[in-house]
Amino acid sequence: MKEELIDRLKRYAEIDTQSDPDSESTPSTEKQRDLLNLLKQELEELGLQTDIDDNGYLFATLESNIANEVPTVGFLAHVDTSHDFNASNVKPQIIENYDGKPIQLGDTDRELNQEVFPAMKSVEGHTLMITDGTSLLGADDKAGVAEIMTALTYLVEHPEVKHGRIRVAFTPDEEIGRGPHKFDVKRFDADFAYTMDGSQYGELQFESFNAAEATITCHGVNVHPGSAKDVMVNAIKLGERFDSMLPEDEVPEKTEGYEGFFHLMNFNGTTEKAQLKYIIRDHDRERFEARKACLLEIRDQINTVYNNDPVEVDMYDQYHNMAEKINEVPEVIEVPKRVFKKLGIEPNTEPIRGGTDGSQLSFMGLPTPNIFTGCDNFHGPFEYASIDVMERAVEVILGIAEEIAQPTDK
């Protein structure tokens, strides 16, 4: 299984599938179809029924091999890679039996070391796939793709392993927040699903942030600075004032666990007009709503000083905490917990300080927790995958399929 995972991840990683946040098409880049078409071919070679729609959502079915009816389970992974770093000409490297010492990344001056990345201590002795330092690896989420494909291959080649109906989806544009936007839950036709899009060994995630994005637009009055007294309103100064009125400790670099934050992503402008872009995050719905209200209150406080209401706030919700929906169907979490226990894996159920496709899918009627893939340091040249942990992820997929096929009278 290890060699199959290495081969799959390497082949998939070498295909450039970077998504583009500035594109309005779906998928946002045509090159994502290169991997989707390859996966369609590989799925059909396994004998699975497949279909891919115009938006690049590839669905496949492995039919049940048992007589009794059990829930249909889905497994999902996204094919696109992050736009935060170079994703072309990816050259995966293999490190056997990682000894814990610093690893130079190709001919660059970059290196993987445990002082900077202490989580690497947990993968000592493992086989790692890393980059050559010039690109990201794309294990987010091609490791998940490889794990699902490897598990399907095993089930096809081992019919003695009993399972119900399994649905698989490989999707575009997760990295730009649009993964589920055109996902047809009805067409997918599963009772619940799991995204294989987590990170470190043991992660079983069913709590995500509530998320919103806000654009603050400040309108100034620009006149000649020599005659500006009591006339000029500097939009940049308005933006600075707005940001200074937010709680200074409620920012990403000072929060953890269940603590939410305001994150100023971008600030640019001139005397005449300035814009600030924020993301707002909190696990608790009430605190989340209070954070959004805080932005509106600051707007109102500044606007009361001026006659022309120079500050505008445009805000929209991106996704909500999937725990609200997943907790309504506790078996969705109990199944993988039982599988983890059988496999000797201690589940890490800490909340995601982010979101997954499952965050949106759960509110679209498809409860979808997230499971580890064995990768870390996403979105940059320090990304790596533990092939050993990927093997365990495949075992989890197989275990879930078997667990669901068990009689329900236990």
From Swiss-Prot:
One GO BP annotation of this record: peptide catabolic process
Keyword entries, A-Z: Aminopeptidase, Cytoplasm, Hydrolase, Metal-binding, Metalloprotease, Protease, Zinc
E.C. number: 3.4.11.4
Reaction(s) this enzyme catalyzes, per UniProt: Release of the N-terminal residue from a tripeptide
Entries under CDD domains matching the protein: M20_peptT (cd03892)
Active-site residue numbers: 80, 174
Cofactors: Zn(2+)
Any Pfam family: Peptidase_M20
UniProt xrefs under InterPro entries: ArgE/DapE_CS, Bact_exopeptidase_dim_dom, Peptidase_M20, Peptidase_M20_dimer, Peptidase_M20B
Localization of this protein: Cytoplasm
Similarity section: Belongs to the peptidase M20B family.
Amino-acid positions noted as binding Zn(2+) 2 in the UniProt annotation, renumbered to this chain: 140, 175, 379
GO cellular component: cytosol
Organism: Staphylococcus carnosus (strain TM300)
Recorded superkingdom: Bacteria
Binding site for Zn(2+) 1: 78, 140, 197
Cofactor note: Binds 2 Zn(2+) ions per subunit.
GO molecular function, one term: metallopeptidase activity
Residue stretches spanning the membrane: none
Region (Disordered): 11-30
Name recorded for this polypeptide: Peptidase T
Role: Cleaves the N-terminal amino acid of tripeptides.
